[in-house]
Amino acid sequence: KAAKDAGATVAPAHTERYYQEVTIPRGKKLKKAKEHELVLESDVFINVPILKTHNSTTLTIAMKNLMGNIWDRGFWHRNGLHQCIADFVSHRKPDLNIVDAYRVMRRNGPRGVSTNDVALMKYQIISDDIVATDAAATKIFGKEIDQIKHIDIAGKLGYGVDDLSKLNIRRLKV
């Protein structure tokens, strides 16, 4: 309702007919997936994940957020979730990733059980490199990249930069 009231177009995603099969040629476990047609038809793809913990992947950041564009996420969970996430990144990377880490779910993600699970962090991470985006966001939780398997896999496969020392990072204080 809020989106419609603000003038946004709300796209349906509740039935399989809105998804088209894509092949993942470089995929190790994920060879194909059904991706939402509006993502496939877009000229520019901007990924805006909310940083949070997740019981299956430790963290949800930019790469994990792409699962929201997929019809059969259950396949990923049954067939090596971290590898499938990394495989999908080889298909099409967003043009821009903007991680909302203003209020961060620090525990009990992805849904949380109380407001005590959320902390005010006041961060935003912006990059055109999805692996670098996720690598930087892991530091907010004090994690190393190799602790989040899909980030480690994607970095090792060359899908982006996972070594923060190789990046030109600009920190802005507002």
Each predicted region: which residue ranges?
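N-terminal and secondary-structure boundary signal
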Residues: 1-174
